[in-house]
């Protein structure tokens, strides 16, 4: 049974997250329906990351096992043909190596959070950025983010309903930069806790707005207490932009 590796892009707004839902639209459900329309096979795909409601992706990776040995280009063309009414696009398709798994073979996940930092609200990117009217100090945000890098107990930045067995994670990259009218926050790690990126982002915005100091972020991290977290950033500006497999 050949396994296909798919690179996927989607707008998260129409979906109740990536994971299949019994009665609500999902990215997983859209892709699985496209597979069935293509070859008649009912499948269960696996993904590198199960993004929440409203979270977008430009670099999600999934795999699908098919009964027939189809050319990868045929899979690519067919799935996109059956996804035209969805906010989902297959960017590439290839036959996966033996033993490769979209989730368990991943050793790096990269997220981008976009903040539109201007007075005028977004017209074209509504629902794709977090709009902040107040000028944010991105340099202070970046300085505070450096306290988050490394191996830590991230209980403060962990959603109360997170199912991860341990709150301990290693954050490899935490970077804040200004790009025109936007502030971009980049985070990279092998894996993240539920809503960890949005929790860290919302907290760093408190620093940028002058309501928190750089050292307040360090203190919040060390408190290991969810009540010490800043406001959780909305899903709108969050993107899964890449997954690494050491290849």
UniProtKB/Swiss-Prot annotation:
Q: Which family does it belong to?
A: Belongs to the tRNA pseudouridine synthase TruA family.
Q: Does the keyword Glycoprotein apply?
A: no
* Role, per record: Formation of pseudouridine at positions 38, 39 and 40 in the anticodon stem and loop of transfer RNAs.
Pfam families, alphabetized: PseudoU_synth_1
Q: Which reaction does it catalyse?
A: uridine(38/39/40) in tRNA = pseudouridine(38/39/40) in tRNA
Q: Provide the binding site for substrate.
A: 111
Which CDD domains does UniProt cross-reference here? PseudoU_synth_EcTruA
Which proteins does it associate with, and in what oligomeric form?
A: Homodimer.
**Does this entry carry the keyword tRNA processing?**
yes
UniProt-listed Enzyme Commission number(s): 5.4.99.12
Q: Name one GO molecular function term.
A: tRNA pseudouridine(38-40) synthase activity
Q: Which residues are catalytic? A: 52
Q: Which UniProt keywords apply?
A: Isomerase, tRNA processing
Which GO BP annotation is one of this protein's? tRNA pseudouridine synthesis
What is this protein's record name?
tRNA pseudouridine synthase A
């Amino acid at each position: 049974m050949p396994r296909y590796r798919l690179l996927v892009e989607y707008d998260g707004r129409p979906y109740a997250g990536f994971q299949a839902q019994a009665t609500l639209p999902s990215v997983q459900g859209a892709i699985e329906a496209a597979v069935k329309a293509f070859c008649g096979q009912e499948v269960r795909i696996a993904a590198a990351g199960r993004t929440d409601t409203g979270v977008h992706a430009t670099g999600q990776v999934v795999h699908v096992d098919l009964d027939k040995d189809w050319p990868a280009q045929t899979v690519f063309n067919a799935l996109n043909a059956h996804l035209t009414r969805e906010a989902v696009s297959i960017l590439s398709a290839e036959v996966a190596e033996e033993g490769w798994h979209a989730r368990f073979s991943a050793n790096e996940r990269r997220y981008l959070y976009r903040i539109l930092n201007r007075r005028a609200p977004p017209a074209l990117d509504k629902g794709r950025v977090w709009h902040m009217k107040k000028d944010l100090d991105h340099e202070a945000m970046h300085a505070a983010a450096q306290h988050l890098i490394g191996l830590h107990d991230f209980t403060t930045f962990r959603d109360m309903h997170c199912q991860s067995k341990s709150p301990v994670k290693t954050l490899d990259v935490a970077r804040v930069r200004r790009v025109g009218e936007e502030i971009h926050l980049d985070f990279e790690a092998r894996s993240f806790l539920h809503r960890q990126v949005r929790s860290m982002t919302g907290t760093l915005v408190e620093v940028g707005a002058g309501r928190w100091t750089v050292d307040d972020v360090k203190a919040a991290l060390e408190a290991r207490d969810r009540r010490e977290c800043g406001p959780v950033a909305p899903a709108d500006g969050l993107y899964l932009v890449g997954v690494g497999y050491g290849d």
